[in-house]
C-alpha cells in the first residue's frame, strides 16, 4: 500500500467529494468502507471512470485520507489520474462526482469517458 501525504499528493480529493462520500458511508452503516476510484477501458473515447465502495485495501493500492474518508486507487488507474481533481458538484443538472483530469486529451459529449 502506498500512502500519499497531502503535501506530495499527485491528485486532489476535494472537501466536497470527501464530505459526500462520508455521508454515503454513514448511510450504508459500514464505517469500514473506502472509496475506490478506477479507470477502465470503454466508453466512446476509450477510457471511463468508475467509483465503488470497497472494504479491502490491496497491497499495491495508493491510498489517501481526507476528512476521515479513505480513497483507493489501483496502480493501473493511478497513471491516468495523476494531476486529476476528484470533486462532487451540485447544480441545476443534478449532483454528481466529477473528475477533472489534465491527462484527458479529449472527452465524449456525455462526459463519462475520455482518451489519454
Swiss-Prot record:
Superkingdom of origin organism: Bacteria
Binding site for iron-sulfur cluster: 44, 108, 110
A Pfam entry, by short name: Fe-S_biosyn
Cofactor note: Binds 1 iron-sulfur cluster per subunit.
GO BP terms: iron-sulfur cluster assembly
SUPFAM superfamilies (UniProt xref): HesB-like domain
Family of this protein: Belongs to the HesB/IscA family.
Subunit structure as annotated in this protein's UniProt entry: Homodimer.
Protein name, UniProt field: Putative iron-sulfur cluster insertion protein ErpA
Organism per entry: Dechloromonas aromatica (strain RCB)
Amino acid at each position: 500500500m502506498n500512502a500519499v501525504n497531502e503535501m506530495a499528493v499527485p491528485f486532489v480529493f476535494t472537501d466536497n467529494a470527501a464530505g459526500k462520500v462520508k455521508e454515503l458511508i454513514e448511510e450504508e452503516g459500514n464505517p469500514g468502507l473506502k472509496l475506490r476510484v478506477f479507470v477502465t477501458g470503454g466508453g466512446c473515447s476509450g477510457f471511463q471512470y468508475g467509483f465503488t465502495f470497497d472494504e479491502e485495501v490491496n497491497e499495491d493500492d495508493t491510498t489517501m485520507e481526507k476528512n476521515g474518508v479513505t480513497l483507493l486507487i489501483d496502480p493501473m488507474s493511478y497513471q491516468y489520474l495523476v494531476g486529476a481533481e476528484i470533486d462532487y458538484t451540485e447544480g441545476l443538472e443534478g449532483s454528481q462526482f466529477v473528475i477533472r483530469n489534465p491527462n484527458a486529451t479529449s472527452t465524449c459529449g456525455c462526459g463519462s469517458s475520455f482518451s489519454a
